[in-house]
Amino acid sequence: LSQRSKLTVVGAQMVLVNTVKERVNLMKNRKTYAELQSELMKRYPQGVTSGGVSVDDIIQLKIQNTYDTHLDIARDMAGVMRADMAAYDENPENFTQSLGCWSGFHAQQMIRSVKRLRGTTKGAYVYLSGWMVAGLRNRWGHLPDQSMHEKTAVADLINEIYTSLRQADEVELNDLFKALSAAREAGDIAAEKAAIQAIDNFESHVVPIIADIDAGFGNEHATYLLAKELIKAGACCLQIENQVSDAKQCGHQDGKVTVPREDFIEKLRACRLAFEELGVDDGVIVARTDSLGAGLTQKVPVSMEPGDLASEYIKWLEVEPITDTSPAREGEMLLSLNGEIVRPVRLPNGLFAFKENTGRARVVEDCIASLTQGGADLLWIETATPDVEEIAGMVNEIRKVVPNAKLTYNNSPSFNWTLNLRKQVRQGWINEGKISETDYPDGNALMSAEFDDTELGREADARLARFQHDISTKAGVFHNLITLPTFHLTAKGMDELSNGYFGEDRMLAYVGTIQREEIRRGISAVKHQHEVGSDLGDTFKEMVGGDRALKAGGAKNTMNQFDAA
C-alpha cells in the first residue's frame, strides 16, 4: 500500500474503533474486565470461591451475560435509537436500516453478517413484521395480515430474537476468553492485554427492534397492556397504525378502514404510558398512516368546535345534499357542513366513504396530528409504489408545521420494484424528450429479461441501488426497512435447493449453493455446532469439572474439518 492508502486504512480503523466504543458506552450495564476483577477479588481474595469456583470463570460468565433482563435491552436500545435519530437530524445520510425477521436465527444471522461487513452493528436494526407473525408464527397456520393471530405471538418473537442475539454474544465472547486463556498459558503478556481489550471493546449483537403492534389489538387499554408485554420482551420502538383494529388489513391490500384521529392519538398515548411506566423514558413510537390507500372510516367523530380534530376529519367525507327529491330518511345520520345539511355516503356494512383523491391530504393531516398531539417520534406513510418524489412532497408539507419530522419507510416486497422503477425511468425520459414512447414498451412488458442489459434497465437498477439514499436525503426517511425479506428468501432458497437436490445435482446442489459459499464467505454458521453454543457447554463443563469435563469439541468432532474455513 502507498503511504496515503495506509493512512486512509488507519483512519478508517480509528473511526470504526470509535464507533464501536460509542455503541459499547451506550450499553449502560457493561463493566470492564478490570472492574469486575476488582469487585470479585474483594469478595474472594484467594481468586476462588469456597466451593472452588474461579474468579476468572465468574468474570467470564458475567461479561458473556450482556444483559440481565430484556427490559434493560429496551432501555439501552431506546438510547441507541435516539442517538441515531439525532445523527440523522445533523446529516440525513446517516439513515438506518433493518430487515424483517420471523425467527431469532434470522435476526442473529443478519446481525452477524452486518458485523462481518462493517465491523460494527451501528445503523442496523431488526424489524418485527406483524405480517410475518400472522403468516408464519401463530398457532393457526398461515394467516393473512388481519390481526387474526394471538397477541402473545409478537412478544414471544421479540423475546426469541433477543435470546438469539444474546447467545451470539456468548459464543463470540467465549472465543475471546479462550484466546485470553491461551495467552496466559503461553505467558504472552501482550496477547493477554490484547484479549482483555477485545473483551472490553466487544460490541453486542443486540440492536434495536422496531415492533409492529398492528392497530393495537383492541381498544386503547388493550393497546397499553400489549405494549407493556412487547416492551418487557425488549422492544424499544413500537409501530402502530391508524386502521380499525377488528377490520385491519395489510397496508398493501384494499378495504382499509381508518379511525378518527382522536382515537388514534389515544392509542399513541397508551404506548407512551407503557414506556413511561416501565422506565423506558426514551422509548420510540412510530405512527403509521394508511390513509393514502384507505377510502373508508368506521365512524364519524363528534366535532365540538370548528377546526378541531373531528371537523378536520369529517370534512373529507363523501356527502350528498338533502333535497326535495332526496329528503332525509327516518333514522338517517345527517351532518352540517359549510352551512348545508348533508348525508354522509354510507355503505351497506355501515362504513362511511371518503371523497375520492383525498388520501394525500388526509395523510398530511394525520401525520401532523400524530406528531403534535399524539407525541409520536417517527412517521410511517404506507404507499402504493416506491416513489421518492411522492413521499418528499408529503413530507415537505408536514415539515412546514413540524420541521424535524422523520419517517420510517417500508421498502415493501409488495411493490414490483423492477417494473415500477423501469416505468419511472421510461416516463421521465419521455418527458425529457430523451426517448419516444415507441422506444420501450409500456406496462408489464418492461419486466422482460430482454431489458435487463439495456440503458433503461441499467438506469432503473442504478436508481434501485441508491433508492434508500435518495429517499433519506430528499424525503426525510430516517429508517429504511424491508418488511418480508426472510419470507421470500426462505421460499426462494428452498426452491433453489430443492430443484437441484431432487433433480440431477443432488449433493452438488447443497454443496455448491450453500456449504461452499458459507466457507468462502466466512459465514460462521458453517460450523453449526459452534454456532448454537456447543463450545459454550464445553467451557462451562471445564469451569465446574476441570479435567473431568466430558467435552464435545475434541479431536473426533467433525466440525474440525472446517477449521480452515
Positions of predicted regions on the chain:
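N-terminal amphipathic/basic-hydrophobic helices that include classical n-h-c signal peptides
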Residues: L1-L26
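Conserved alpha/beta catalytic core and glycan-binding cleft of carbohydrate-active enzymes
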Residues: W429-K556
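Glycine-centered flexibility motif
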Residues: K6, G100, G104, G216, ...
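Histidine-centered beta-alpha loop that forms part of the nucleotide-sugar donor binding/catalytic region
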Residues: Q243, S412, D535
